[in-house]
Regions:
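Generic signature of intrinsically disordered, low-complexity segments enriched in small/polar residues
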Residues: 6, 33-34, 51, 92, ...
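Conserved long alpha-helical elements within nucleotide-processing catalytic cores of c-di-GMP signaling
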Residues: 16-75, 82-86, 100-104, 108
Length: 117
């Protein structure tokens, strides 16, 4: 009997990098992104912001998934949204010279999502 292990390797690789419940970047992959962003900032003098969000203990699993989805949808493709703890999320916002005000807009949207849950 012959097994195709390529699909299993892709599944295992994906599980290692993403949170199983929310499908957001997990803590270890977030810290890899953060290290790269710090190195890039040193090279080209770019900036970034980190937003840490801790949800209340009474948050249901469904509300948690809704929050994660809304959080992911409120950010840009170049930003990194991560679940690093049971009720803890972190967003890495990359700030460019051409669009510095975008980070403030994203922070406002994240605040609205947080207050809505």
């Amino acid at each position: 009997m012959i097994f195709d292990t390529t699909n299993l390797e892709n599944i295992n690789s994906n599980n290692i990098q993403f949170d199983e419940a929310t499908n957001l970047v997990n803590a270890s992959l977030f810290y890899e992104h953060l290290e790269r962003q710090i190195a890039q900032s040193r090279r080209d003098n770019s900036q970034f912001r980190i937003i840490r969000i801790i949800l209340p203990d009474l948050m249901s699993e469904l509300s948690l998934l809704d929050f994660a989805s809304a959080l992911n949808q409120s950010t840009r493709n170049e930003d990194v949204v991560s679940r690093i703890g049971r009720l803890e999320f972190v967003v890495l916002l990359r700030i460019s010279q051409s669009t510095p005000d975008k980070s403030k807009d994203i922070i406002g949207r994240i605040s609205d999502i947080y207050e809505g849950h």
